[in-house]
């Protein structure tokens, strides 16, 4: 997966999302080094077993037009190299730079921010025209962008059902894209144990605490029964992906635990495309 686009448009968020899904990632890689990078990662490993994500942009200081030639050569060797291009409106980019107080990569040329954005659009146009998908992030927040990357690009082939298990805090709202929503607030709350309060549902202490609660076992078994019954039917209905969300008060303990537990069960059941996303933690 090749990730490119305008500075401030969400490329770093996309790369971090791929990394969280066990892609081997490299950012700011010059195009001329891309063939050697891919060869080094594939050496001794079947092509189908490797998931790579590479960030390429104006910082690469290389001839971006070379990318088309490399992608064509890679395809002949059975390597699928998809190019995602992230962009946003000038207004959105200017606001993001104002909020973060970061400098634009082209500011060293003595350009004001609007001029730097315009210049970057010109420099990256060869990449945009090659892109398999152009993603406008002007109206997306970080959580929405991560979810879109996971569901539309990171999980793989669309001829099979991809599962995303998500945790969230009810006080911040239910994820609009969720297909199934389960309320984990009925479960015992580790928050009230001072030793467990700083931890999350991914930590062993919280897992052990909840694993030993009878209500948690009963709750989990009933959800497993529901998902094992209906997810195969959704796959037969040609769905590409399903989001299963678990909510609790703070999105830190119970919801995270349940999302991780159900994702683990799905992998054990043989579902090939499974990911987790913890909205309040990631």
Swiss-Prot record:
InterPro entries (alphabetical): P-loop_NTPase, RapZ-like, RapZ-like_N, RapZ_C
UniProt keyword annotations, A-Z: ATP-binding, GTP-binding, Nucleotide-binding
A matching Pfam family: PapZ_C
Domain of life of the source: Bacteria
Presence of the UniProt keyword Nucleotide-binding in the record: yes
Residues the record lists as binding ATP: 5-12
Entry's family note: Belongs to the RapZ-like family.
PANTHER family: RNASE ADAPTER PROTEIN RAPZ (PTHR30448:SF0)
Name of this protein: Nucleotide-binding protein XCV3122
HAMAP family given in the database record: RapZ_like
Residues that span the membrane, as ranges: none
Organism: Xanthomonas euvesicatoria pv. vesicatoria (strain 85-10) (Xanthomonas campestris pv. vesicatoria)
């Amino acid at each position: 997966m090749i990730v490119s686009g305008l500075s401030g448009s969400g490329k770093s968020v996309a790369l971090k999302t791929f990394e969280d899904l066990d892609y081997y990632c490299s950012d700011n890689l010059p195009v001329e080094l891309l063939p050697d990078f891919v060869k080094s990662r594939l050496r001794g490993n079947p092509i189908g077993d490797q998931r790579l994500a590479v960030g390429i942009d104006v910082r690469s200081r290389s001839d971006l037009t070379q990318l088309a030639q490399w992608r064509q050569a890679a395809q002949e060797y059975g390597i699928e190299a998809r190019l995602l291009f992230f962009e946003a409106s000038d207004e959105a980019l200017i606001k993001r730079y104002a909020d973060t107080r970061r400098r634009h990569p082209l500011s060293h040329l003595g350009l004001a921010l609007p001029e730097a954005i315009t210049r970057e659009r010109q420099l990256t146009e060869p990449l945009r025209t090659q892109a398999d998908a152009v993603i406008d992030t002007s109206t997306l927040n970080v959580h929405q962008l991560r979810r879109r990357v996971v569901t539309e690009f990171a999980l793989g082939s669309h001829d099979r059902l991809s599962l995303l298990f998500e945790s969230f805090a009810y006080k911040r709202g239910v994820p609009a894209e969720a297909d199934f929503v389960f309320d984990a607030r009925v479960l015992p709350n580790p928050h009230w144990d001072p030793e467990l309060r700083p931890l999350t549902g991914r930590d062993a202490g919280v897992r052990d605490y909840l694993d030993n609660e009878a209500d948690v076992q009963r709750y989990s078994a009933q959800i497993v029964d529901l998902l094992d019954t209906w997810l195969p039917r959704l796959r037969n209905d040609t769905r590409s992906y399903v989001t299963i969300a678990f909510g609790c008060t703070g999105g830190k303990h119970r919801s995270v635990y349940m999302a991780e537990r159900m994702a683990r069960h799905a992998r054990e059941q043989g579902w090939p495309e499974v990911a987790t996303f913890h909205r309040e933690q990631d």
